[in-house]
A protein has these predicted regions:
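Extracellular glycoside hydrolase catalytic/binding regions
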Residues: 6, 10-24, 35, 39-184
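Catalytic core of nucleotidyl cyclases, primarily class III adenylyl/guanylyl cyclases
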Residues: 32
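Charged, cofactor-coupling segments
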Residues: 29
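Aromatic- and acidic-residue-enriched carbohydrate-binding clefts of CAZyme catalytic domains
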Residues: 1-3
Length: 184
């Protein structure tokens, strides 16, 4: 919807041009800003209103718009990192369908091909997404690292969580071992 996209662009322009009361500096000129994120967990559940490329096209257009105003800061989509392999392929690979089938209208592989998106921002909520600990969770981290590496882009695992506190320490240790590798 062009009207909604216009409103979003007005919001972006206002935000990036906002002057900090204390420093007198526009946000787009601030060294305190690490990057801009287009949205937190954007989704476009696949139905008659949300076709395959809706979110991709939106991210491509809006990230380019942000860069047209502020070419100096990085931009991310803010998506959860869902894939669009299709239901049959997700089942064939024995992957949790909600995160890999394309149901949410997100295609992490494709989003990482956008030139004006500078890094990936996957999230991971193991029990909410039906992941098996020690299997699906580790595959999720590795697959996202491969995707961003292939796109020659960095990755920040922005959010992750596990409801079961008795398993949390061990799981977090496994996840961080993959992320940090031999660095520590």
């Amino acid at each position: 919807n062009e009207t909604i996209k216009g409103w979003y662009k007005d919001y972006i322009k206002t935000l990036l041009n906002h002057t900090n009361y204390y420093t007198g500096e526009k946000l787009m000129d601030s060294e305190a800003v690490f990057s801009w994120e287009l949205s937190n967990e954007p989704r476009c559940t696949v139905d008659e209103f949300c076709k395959d490329d809706i979110l991709y096209n939106w991210a491509k257009e809006m990230s380019a718009y942000v860069k047209s105003i502020d070419p100096y800061h990085m931009v991310s989509v803010g998506d959860e990192g869902f894939y669009n392999l299709g239901y049959q392929e997700a089942a064939r690979q024995d992957l949790p369908s909600s995160a890999y089938s394309g149901y949410y209208g997100v295609d992490f592989d494709k989003l990482m091909t956008i030139d004006t998106v500078d890094f990936g921002t996957p999230h991971m909520y193991v029990d909410q997404w039906g992941f098996d600990l020690g299997d699906d969770d580790l595959e999720w981290i590795k697959r996202h690292a491969q995707t961003t590496s292939s796109a020659d882009k960095p990755i920040i695992f922005e959010e992750f969580g596990l409801t079961d506190k008795t398993k949390r320490d061990a799981a977090y240790s496994d996840w961080l071992d993959i992320v940090t590798g031999d660095y520590y």
